[in-house]
Amino acid sequence: MGEVAKEEVEERRSIVAVNPQPSKGLVSSAVDLIEKAVVYLFHDKSKPCHYLSGNFAPVVDETPPCPDLPVRGHLPECLNGEFVRVGPNPKFMPVAGYHWFDGDGMIHGMRIKDGKATYASRYVKTSRLKQEEYFEGPKFMKIGDLKGFFGLFMVQMQLLRAKLKVIDVSYGVGTGNTALIYHHGKLLALSEADKPYVVKVLEDGDLQTLGLLDYDKRLSHSFTAHPKVDPFTDEMFTFGYAHTPPYVTYRVISKDGVMRDPVPITIPASVMMHDFAITENYSIFMDLPLYFQPKEMVKGGKLIFSFDATKKARFGVLPRYAKDDSLIRWFELPNCFIFHNANAWEEGDEVVLITCRLENPDLDMVNGAVKEKLENFKNELYEMRFNMKTGAASQKQLSVSAVDFPRINESYTTRKQRYVYGTILDNITKVKGIIKFDLHAEPEAGKKKLEVGGNVQGIFDLGPGRYGSEAVFVPRERGIKSEEDDGYLIFFVHDENTGKSEVNVIDAKTMSAEPVAVVELPNRVPYGFHAFFVNEEQLQWQQTDV
């Protein structure tokens, strides 16, 4: 067998076709009746569900490719490719509770080629979604259900359905709604409770779910929504967290897509570990006190994840090719939580982490009828340093609230970079602007709000009633030989005044208030999570075997 043929066989083996085998019938109907009775008795449906209304509400249908969209301005040549953003879009209304993290993953994609734009939106065809389509209704528990005794009951309902083979959990139960990344010829849709789903971008910009990626059965645990690709080695670094030991498992995936042996990371308890970071020689794990506490859920009527403000924040720095965690160095900093890191690198004896640091997180803030608020919500850009020689740790505040979704020119991942691009939050879930930080400049003392000056080099304000999403940096030229900020920021925008959505492109160097391009979209695009840009070269190199 020739080398090309061997490679094609390997690719076919690595993508798993998802064909769950749920079961309708008397057993399924009986379980449904029990659930309906308990929901009727114990769930308060009178409270409106904020995250199913307004522009959080799901769109009813997928959108096949809509070509030749109206473009104001021009789309630069470096944007030839597919801009994609994923987010929650529940296909079926929930039986009871609903948390913003619960919805089925829908990818909104814009194919750009030769100055023209095509829009499409498609569900990530997860095992969970396929089964609920089969039943024509929800059958899997939701984060929004997991409070109090009612939460315990909903957990038991899912376990019962699985035991009776009403639902098939053999392919996982994730939604694919959180983030996207490209590695070894594959665009991956991610949610941290599941394995990656492979999504193919078709020539016309359409999106097709090919199946699950289990790395030839070497991946048996969950997979973070925020793996890291080293642009200098083309390797991908990832981990999964669990509610039973080992609570964290670290993995390295070669540039050829081969997953190496698991490395269990020892931490004292089950925590939510949403992100991590890599440098040239290290991986950084974050043991932060947002604990998985089912007992507290039942006793205190709390959400199943609860934050302990009395505990320190711990950061573990591990040589990134370590065979076990015996060489990990743990550092402590004041109590906090972190959803998203920007980058990390090494300076002498120190490992430097640039991150968005959050105080007193409460996942209930984006749950059910709870409207988003900014009171007591402190999410700020920070620099953290870990001295590998002395064991000392320090941190420095780089901004006031509220900043999130930090992105960089990803050609600099693992290396020291100068600029960070983030979103300015009007409230917990709405983005009112895009901000550019210069890490070579000092923050202005005494600032009470985010404004240009000091280390804030530019702000793109979306205007009243207009809200955006994570902005992705696209360089004019890939690599680190050109100017770091020579490129564009691309992101989705929704105008609540008109009900219309669009894609904006702005100049990352100047942060001019005048967009380089505005692409008018045919449909509303709900607020969502993370975005990614697949360049033309990556599109042409997609591994397409099923």
Curated annotation (Swiss-Prot):
Q: Which cofactor does it need?
A: Fe(2+)
Q: Pfam families, alphabetically?
A: RPE65
| Top enzyme category | oxidoreductase
Q: In which tissues is it expressed?
A: In vegetative and floral tissues.
Any idea of its EC number? 1.14.99.n4
Cofactor: record remark: Binds 1 Fe(2+) ion per subunit.
Q: Name the protein family.
A: Belongs to the carotenoid oxygenase family.
Q: Which UniProt keywords apply?
A: Cytoplasm, Dioxygenase, Iron, Metal-binding, Oxidoreductase
Q: Which residues form the signal peptide?
A: none
Q: Which reaction does it catalyse?
A: all-trans-zeaxanthin + 2 O2 = 4,9-dimethyldodeca-2,4,6,8,10-pentaenedial + 2 (3R)-hydroxy-beta-ionone
- What this protein is called in its record is Carotenoid 9,10(9',10')-cleavage dioxygenase
GO molecular function, a single term: metal ion binding
State its location(s). Cytoplasm
InterPro entries found in the cross-reference section: Carotenoid_Oase (IPR004294)
Q: Where is Fe cation bound in this sequence? A: H226, H274, H340, H530
Primary location recorded for the protein, binned into one broad class = cytoplasm
Primary role: Cleaves a variety of carotenoids symmetrically at both the 9-10 and 9'-10' double bonds. Catalyzes the formation of 4,9-dimethyldodeca-2,4,6,8,10-pentaene-1,12-dialdehyde and probably hydroxydihydro-beta-ionone from zeaxanthin.
